[in-house]
């Protein structure tokens, strides 16, 4: 399912924490990792100066050496590798290389400070989510700063074991569900399917209509569970009332989900944020890894 993955790195402590998780993806079917480093245009502005060209060559050589060491470490763990250094806008280059290499998934990291503080998502990762037609796995880890040192605590074990799939039953949400149905091959043992009745909408409905919506939506959830059973995936269903992102994060914690898999719709995350920001808030606030699957809206 995720045989070929792309791992972009800037060699930071945060990227190294995600790198340490890559061998665990072998249980999800990963066999090959394409290691990518992007020299950002802001790092070495190109011009006609020989000095700039020389600086670019030195930076590229250094990155190639780091990638070579990383590749040897992965090969020692039984993964095949390839490496590449490119120059340009990091997010756009990551998406371009992912398409050229025909990878099945992009793996990146988000950083946080503690279980009680917001997970911070870097601009590059956010832009990749906005641009990539390929599924993106955002790994999560906690950052501890002590005595001037940065330590990243891994939280990536058994990533695909118990998957939470929030759905609004839309055509777009089918994009993620179609991936979820295939996750048994990635080691998934259970799927939790969640639908949240948005309190901002439902508070304007009469009680009898709310009861009708609950009955209809529970029937939809049970149908999805039966669909998953055809793929030999046990499933439990939850119907909640409240703010969708808040309920999703709460269920993820209560049920000890190891991954949240959901769709991002539209042509940009800005569009999604304007209609409620459920996806954006889950990605930013979740302490669990997030698998984002893009759905292009039809026009």
Residue ranges and their predicted role:
Residues 1-52, 156-207, 211, 227, ...:
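Small/aliphatic-rich secondary-structure junction motif
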Residues 53-65, 209-219:
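A short acidic, glycine-rich active-site loop
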Residues 74-81, 230-236:
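A short helix-to-beta-strand connector/capping loop
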Residues 85-94, 239-247:
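Charged docking surfaces used in two-component/phosphorelay signaling
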Residues 204-262:
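Glycine/small-residue-rich hydrophobic helix-like segments
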């Amino acid at each position: 399912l995720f045989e070929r993955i792309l791992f972009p790195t800037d060699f930071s402590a945060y990227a190294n924490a995600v790198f340490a998780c890559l061998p665990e993806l072998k249980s999800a079917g990963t066999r090959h990792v394409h290691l990518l480093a992007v020299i950002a245009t802001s790092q070495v502005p190109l011009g006609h100066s020989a000095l700039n060209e020389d600086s670019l060559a030195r930076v590229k050589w250094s990155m190639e050496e780091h990638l070579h060491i990383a590749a040897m470490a992965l090969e020692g763990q039984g993964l095949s590798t390839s490496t590449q250094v490119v120059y340009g806008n990091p997010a756009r280059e990551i998406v371009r290389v992912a398409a050229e290499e025909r990878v099945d998934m992009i793996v990146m990291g988000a950083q946080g400070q503690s279980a009680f503080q917001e997970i911070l998502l870097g601009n590059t990762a956010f832009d990749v989510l906005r641009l990539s037609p390929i599924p993106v796995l955002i790994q999560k880890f906690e950052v501890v700063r002590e005595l001037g040192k940065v330590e990243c605590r891994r939280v990536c074990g058994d990533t695909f074991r118990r998957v939470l799939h929030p759905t609004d039953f839309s055509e777009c949400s089918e994009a993620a569900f179609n991936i979820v149905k295939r996750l048994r091959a990635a080691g998934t043992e259970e799927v939790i399917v969640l639908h949240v009745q948005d309190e901002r909408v439902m508070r304007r409905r009469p009680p009898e209509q709310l009861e009708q919506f609950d009955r209809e939506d529970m029937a939809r959830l049970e149908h999805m569970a039966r669909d998953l059973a055809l793929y030999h995936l046990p499933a439990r269903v939850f119907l909640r009332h409240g703010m969708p992102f808040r309920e999703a994060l709460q269920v993820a914690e209560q049920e000890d989900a190891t991954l949240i898999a959901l769709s991002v719709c539209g042509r940009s995350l800005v569009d999604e944020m304007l209609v409620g920001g459920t996806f954006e808030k889950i990605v930013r606030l979740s302490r669990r890894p997030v698998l984002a699957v893009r759905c292009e809206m039809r026009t």
